Design a protein with these regions (language model features):
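Interaction-mediating elements
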Residues: 1-112
Length: 112
């Protein structure tokens, strides 16, 4: 059940296309079926980093069974993808990783 949550201080023209591409890419990177991937994109113009409102992204990737020993590789792949799609330089793109225990992810009336 991967969740990719993206907060950006610059808007994206075709959000639906971007969200769909992001879903496919996260499934590919994590080797999971896209059926359970969730992607949330939020435009928030009230977002600065290092006293600058230049384009920036804050990203959360949460997943059951996230291979924490591979977060460096996963980070590189996600940053390459997001930077190419949004134009945000990688030094202004941040990812927070969370490996969610199955008993802490509710779904379909229970937990995973």
């Amino acid at each position: 059940m991967p969740l990719l949550k993206i907060i950006s201080n610059t808007d994206i023209a075709d959000k639906n296309a971007f969200i769909g591409q992001s879903s496919k890419e996260i499934a590919r990177i994590l080797g999971k079926t896209e059926k359970y991937v969730m992607v949330i994109f939020t435009f928030n113009p009230n977002f600065i980093f290092s006293t600058s409102d230049e384009p920036a992204l804050y990203v959360e990737l949460k997943s059951i069974g996230l291979p924490t020993e591979k977060t460096g590789e996963i980070s590189r792949k996600i940053m390459d993808f997001l930077s190419s799609k949004t134009g945000v330089i990688q030094s202004r793109l941040f990812i927070e990783f969370t490996d969610v225990p199955p008993n802490l992810w509710g779904w379909n009336g229970g937990t995973m």
